[in-house]
């Protein structure tokens, strides 16, 4: 696809208006960001762009914030994460979980993905959502300290899913939190060099975080009085 608009004479505008392929996607992404920042309201043009991307079978769509492009994801998966973000935003005890999860999603699936940020924001989303449940009196709680709290006081926590006799109800939640925490390779540096998260691991981290945020904000994981 190529822009068929007569380009102005200056070199920058000429390159902009004659972009194609990946370059054109970058142009569209940048224009959407500019439009949102400048608060330009053009619903008709946005709908036309959405229709063009759909009809062309593009791997990208206009994101929910209308400020950029994002890679297409199965609608059911995207809608589940969107619902989790909306629900978390309505739970005061979840703090900034919704904002962190939304940022993580965009960093993982946006036109210019940032795996390190996506993973970091995923952890922050879970920390925000779980704080009031796991360590409500710890002002500087992290996912690491919360895992320590679970390990030291397992009997204090319950989950909505029935657990067979003799089984530990908090273990599945703990395992997901542990996987997310231990999987962050960029947290610390060392002599061998810091290893950044891959895009695949960052995207997996976002979905782990979405599930955990939903559990904590919905009351599926609770702390006994």
What do the predicted segments below correspond to?
Residues 21-25, 97, 119-122, 126, ...:
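Short runs of predominantly hydrophobic/aromatic residues within well-ordered alpha helices
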Residues 68-152, 222:
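Amphipathic alpha-helical interface elements
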């Amino acid at each position: 696809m190529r822009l068929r608009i007569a380009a102005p004479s200056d070199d920058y505008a000429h390159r902009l208006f004659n972009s194609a392929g990946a370059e054109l996607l970058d142009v569209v992404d940048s224009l959407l960001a500019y439009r949102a920042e400048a608060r330009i309201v053009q619903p008709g043009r946005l709908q036309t762009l959405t229709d063009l991307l759909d009809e062309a079978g593009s791997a990208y769509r206009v994101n929910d914030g209308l400020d950029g492009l994002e890679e297409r994801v199965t609608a059911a998966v995207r809608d589940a994460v969107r619902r989790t973000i909306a629900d978390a935003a309505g739970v005061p005890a979840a703090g900034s979980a919704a904002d962190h999860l939304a940022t993580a999603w965009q960093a993982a699936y946006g036109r210019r993905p940032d795996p390190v940020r996506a993973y970091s924001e995923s952890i922050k989303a879970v920390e925000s959502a779980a704080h009031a449940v796991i360590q409500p009196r710890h002002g500087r709680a992290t996912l690491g300290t919360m895992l320590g709290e679970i390990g030291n006081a397992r009997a204090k926590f319950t989950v909505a899913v029935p657990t067979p006799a003799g089984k530990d109800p908090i273990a599945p939640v703990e395992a997901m939190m542990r996987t997310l925490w231990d999987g962050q390779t960029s947290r610390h540096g060392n002599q061998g060099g810091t290893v950044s998260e891959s895009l695949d691991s960052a995207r997996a981290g976002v979905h782990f975080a979405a599930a955990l945020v939903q559990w904590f904000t919905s009351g599926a994981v609770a702390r006994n009085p």
